[in-house]
Regions:
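Beta-propeller blade signature
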Residues: 76-82
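Lipid interaction determinants
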Residues: 1-76, 88-305
Length: 305
């Protein structure tokens, strides 16, 4: 999600976490645990789970992991991202325009965005700035579970951050509350997480499973990228979500896959994507369908790097 270039043609997946969000007129905060997994095809799954706050009952876990409560879900969605044509203008004009309505909250690395040898529109000098712009097309959206509901546009400008090559600042506009019609500017700081090897695997592994059953009003996705796996299923208005991570749960123990978050009563077949899982065998071809009871999941993509 934080890639600054055109859609990747390589085999690497991307792991991103959000450091903070800032709505126009407010201070930056991070009320959620937000994790985005993106495959080389730009298929992604983005889950945002509310963290405990001072008024959260003490019995609640840092992340919901027993099926609820559903109010701990801020937002979860999945689809395909695309790179839009960048905004190109003279550097001085862009800086002035950007600071007129939404000055970046962190220093921007214009050296990664500027071509100082280029001539701007109308023959202006001083170099041009080209700001990448991305759109995330939602095919599954926890805020659109009722028939006829459509996801709101989701796109933003992606700025390189000075001194932080792993970071990207997204600036855009969207409704804070769906259906309110009140659009606000926002800024989000995204960080890329290093992908790690898992178990005895010699390459970082990834896979995308998808489910589309209109007769059940069901759509779902499972994406594994290296040491993370996330699943999202919406069926007949019911939301099910899982997040897994390959980690050391306690000192002295070997690393294992652990479920770190779960919402909903259905158990999703994330284990198919783990080492030796049903979706990871060499004999399993892209396009194959794996059955989980009455639910058929198609192997949409496999990748390793």
């Amino acid at each position: 999600m934080v890639q600054l270039t055109a859609n990747s043609s390589g085999a690497a997946g991307d792991i991103s976490v959000r450091e903070w969000i800032c709505w126009e007129g407010e201070a930056p905060i991070e009320p959620t645990s937000t994790l985005v997994l993106t495959a080389p095809s730009n298929t992604f799954v983005d889950t945002r789970l509310l963290l405990p706050h001072p008024f959260t009952p003490t019995a609640e876990l840092p992340l919901p992991n027993t099926g609820g409560p559903l109010h701990r879900l801020d937002w979860a969605f999945s689809g395909v991202s695309e790179t839009l044509p960048p905004t190109v203008m003279p550097q001085t004009q862009h800086v002035a325009a950007a600071h007129a309505h939404a000055p970046p909250l962190v220093p921007v690395d214009y050296s990664r965005l500027c071509d100082f040898s280029a001539t701007g529109p109308g023959g202006s000098s001083g170099g041009t700035v080209s700001v990448p712009r991305k759109r995330w097309n939602h095919l599954i959206d926890s805020k659109c579970v009722a028939p006829g509901q459509e996801p709101a546009p989701d796109e933003g400008d992606m700025y390189a951050v000075a001194g932080r090559p792993e970071a990207c600042l997204e600036i855009g506009r969207m409704e804070r509350e769906k259906g309110s019609g009140f659009v606000l500017r926002y800024q989000e700081m995204w960080l890329s997480v290093q992908a790690r090897l898992v178990g005895s695997e010699t390459r970082r592994q990834g896979v995308v499973l998808s489910l589309d059953m209109p007769e059940r009003r069901a759509r779902g996705v499972i994406i594994r990228v290296a040491q993370f796996c996330q699943a999202l299923l919406i069926a007949n208005g019911q939301i099910d979500l899982e997040r897994w991570e390959y980690l050391v749960a306690a000192p002295g123990n070997p690393p294992e896959w652990h479920r770190v978050a779960k919402l909903g009563s259905r158990f999703l077949p994330c284990a198919w994507t783990f080492e030796g899982g049903d979706a990871m065998g060499e004999e399993v071809a892209v396009g194959s369908t794996l059955q989980d009871g009455e639910m058929g999941w198609q192997v949409q993509e496999r990748f390793a790097w």
